[in-house]
Amino acid sequence: MGREVILKSRVPKGYRHPELDGSLRVTRTKNEARLIQEARRLGVPTPVIYDIDTTDATLVMQEIKGPRVKDLLDASGPEQRAKVCEEVGRLVGLLHKGGIAHGDLTTSNMIWSEDRVWFIDFSLGSKKAELEELGVDLHLLREAFQSAHSHIMESFDIIIGSYRNSFPKAAEVLRKVKEIEDRGRYT
């Protein structure tokens, strides 16, 4: 092929009925490929999908080389962190504006390469996402920040500011985030 690729395979789960397992793995593989391609169409950097093997539930996609945003944020100074966080907020806004919820929005599922942020692993994502799913995305990202980046929580405010600037319905989603957080406190 001449290109460096990643193979992402969904392995069979022995505890599931084989027919159900095969169907679920293929459906989830196709869904992830669609979301990656749709996100790219919206202007969010994602890996190029080269092939979808529905027999083995495998994606063949572009390898994105670079540090995870999780690692980059910890190793960067304030100026670089601000640049990265502003881009993260803008890209999340683009995804949400296009109706896509990532489903596992953490700094571990973002890679810094070619001076930009790439989003990976849309396996838990959804298209035509409801307000709740968009809120869960931001809630997960905030939790990831509190867990992995508690010493730079002010950087999360940059993400939210950029998100507000790139997504007209940001205020609604942020209200939903507050509601989700409040539910978590009382359960």
Go through each PLM region and give its residues.
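Short, glycine/acidic-enriched loop or turn micro-motifs at the edges of active sites
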Residues: 54, 65, 107, 124, ...
